[in-house]
Amino acid sequence: MSLSGSDSHLAVSPTLAEDMNSSDTSAGLAETPPADEEKRSIVDTGESVVAMNEPHIVDWDGPDDPGNPVNFSRHIKITNVGIVSALTFITPLASSMFAPGVPQLMEEFHSSSRLLAGFVVSVYVLGFAIGPLILAPASELLGRVPIYHICNICFTVFSIACALSTNLGMLIAFRFFQGCFGSAPVTNGGGTIADLIVQEKRGGVIAIYALGPLLGPVIGPVAGGYLAAARGWRWVFWVLAIVGGGCTLASFLFLRETYPMVLLKRKTQRLIQETGNTHLRSKNDNGMSTRQRFVQAIVRPSRILFRSPIVAASSVYVGIVYGYQYLMFSTFTYVFEDQYAFPTSSAGLTFLGTGVGSLLGLFVIGAVSDRILKAKSKPTPEAPSGAMKPEYRLPPLVWGAFFIPAGLFMYGWSAYYRTHWIVPIIGTGLVGIGNIAVFMCITSYLVDAFTIFAASALAANTVVRSILGALLPMAGQSMYDSMGLGWGNSLLGFIAVVCIPIPWAMMRYGERMREAFDGATIFTIFSGSVSVTRSTFT
């Protein structure tokens, strides 16, 4: 990537998704000299690297600069990833932990509406769709840590507000805002991992991070069922507030800023104070005003979604799978209480089938993902130096896509004929394997392909999947009432079968789609005076 001072052209790196060990990739934008200069001399200030041909440009102090997030100590990386992963577990946990207590809630507020009973759960996921539109670009403008802190505090506050709600309208409103602020770790966590972890080691880390969005909604109803039965539905929110408050405190104590652009900006400001040279600027500074950068950051996720066919296709596929998960979650309580006469406390245990399947898929995919990447990126006669491509993350996705329809058919017809309760739960386990394959592989793919803009790419993905996750459960009960459990789940299974070619097409044609896609359609929105070259994202 280069920024030429003479013509103010911003170039997006064609190696944007490659090894995060490259400081230029991590920082996002690098400087190259004018065409008539063949050599570049460097002045080492001890705090940064300043190019002699661009004497006011501040860069990293070489590839081993300890200020570069990829060079942070192992302890700092583990601490940051651990806290973010914990947050990414808690906020999805809150999406479904409340579900077993809904019958108590509806009785207390004197409502018998099945629609409202489903919506009071899914409105949280709707908040997950709205929050990323602001939070992801804000993290790329202000940094990761301020967004985490603000959202953690607000999540805790709205959890308390939910516990104190006195009517259904209040609870729905507070649940929505709880979801909006709870989306921060899910949206920005992938960006934090991209900041810290080099590409060839990223698959295993994302496997840990993916536990939250997949297992949180599964474990939530198990704990929530017993808690609601013992102490009432309000205590679900009190527990969330207590845990959220503890994580907020840990974040303030230990979480460290990782976004390279913000860190370079801070270095520049520190150098200005030390040297008195007000002409110094970060190599990422393209001269835009704060307003222009804000507009750029806010609009970027939607542009990525609508202008990048690979992001659009992957987001729709993840959205369908995510919607299926929440549709099934919204019906588990009724299915197993009505069909199998499970008590409220035990009904939550039926969610464990999906959890066990997700864990099994997590261990397998986490073990093979980085191995596949390294094996496929070995040097060949065509590519003597080897090449790591985002598409190398996708083979497990192709395998996992078959588990989703198989699990749906098994769950639907076994529950319809009231076979032993373990059979439909095994079916949900197969769906869980497919879910984790889809979520992990596509998250890794987007992080590898967009790196410094990973938060915006994941935000686009999160918006689509959260909208479907909120809307499909609202239609689920009506579908089951009219079609029955057998044909209702079969309809979902047939749709999943139709979607199987999507991951296959992404793996086979994804690189070609990225190369054909003109990166300027995303990045030229920054400013009328800044033009962007094509990015192949390879």
Swiss-Prot record:
Residues carrying covalently attached carbohydrate according to the record: 21, 71
Keyword terms, alphabetized: Glycoprotein, Membrane, Transmembrane, Transmembrane helix, Transport
Region (Disordered): 1-42
Main location: membrane
Protein location: Membrane
Cellular component annotations (GO), alphabetically ordered: membrane
UniProt xrefs under PROSITE patterns: MFS
Superkingdom as given in the UniProt entry: Eukaryota
Family named by the database record: Belongs to the major facilitator superfamily.
Listed name of the protein: MFS-type transporter tndD
